A protein has these predicted regions:
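Ribosome large-subunit tunnel/peptidyl-transferase-proximal elements
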Residues: 2-121, 126, 163, 172-173
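Short, solvent-exposed beta-edge and connector elements
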Residues: 32, 145-146
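Solvent-exposed, flexible loop/coil residues
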Residues: 70-72, 145, 156
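Extended, charged amphipathic interaction segments
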Residues: 120-143
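C-terminal edge-of-domain segments
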Residues: 147-175
Length: 175
């Protein structure tokens, strides 16, 4: 794993591109909350592309929720509590915008796989790596009383995904 400067936005992929049948996609400076992207990435890692897209579409329709495991209780960061959802999930939410961006990213990786490998079905590929890193910060301020000001920053997110096929390559018969 490559090291990165924590104070600066991530440039390029964070993992080495190693794998026999590997396809990648990257989205830069997306206007979505980093917390939502982190939890979606953690949830879809290890699933096939079709399973991930189907689940995220159900999240967009508010039929299934994304489980929230970090920053879901009261604490130093303020009240960021997420309510418990149906089933044995615990805290979770329905992040619409982040789900839409992840569906676009997965479809982009599948298109890249179709371009690169003619004999592999991208629907059967597995998501081996997915990450959400903080992107650019547009700094601003809000004037307050008595000459003070409070920061009003706009945060963006960089997303990356690797999908991989683990089976044997299917040979097509040529006539």
């Amino acid at each position: 794993m490559m090291s990165r400067n924590q104070g600066q936005p991530q440039s390029g992929y964070t993992q080495l591109l190693e794998g026999s049948f590997l396809a990648t996609a990257r989205a830069v400076n997306i206007d979505v909350h980093h917390k939502h992207c982190y939890h979606i990435a953690k949830f879809i890692r290890g699933k096939t592309t079709v399973q991930a897209i189907d689940y995220l579409e159900r999240v967009m329709r508010k039929q299934d929720a994304i489980p929230y495991t970090r920053r879901s209780r009261k604490g130093k960061g303020g009240n960021t509590m997420a309510g418990h959802r149906k089933g044995k999930m615990g805290p979770g939410a329905y992040p619409y915008k982040a789900s839409r961006e992840f569906i676009r990213l997965i479809n982009s990786a599948m298109d890249n796989a179709r371009q690169r490998y003619d004999t592999i079905d991208p629907d059967e590929m597995v998501i081996t790596h997915v990450a959400a890193h903080r992107g650019q910060i547009s700094r601003g301020f809000r004037p307050r009383a008595r000459g003070r000001a409070t920061p009003k920053n706009h945060y963006q997110v960089n997303l990356e995904i690797f999908i991989e096929h683990f089976g044997e390559e299917v040979e097509e018969d040529e006539f």
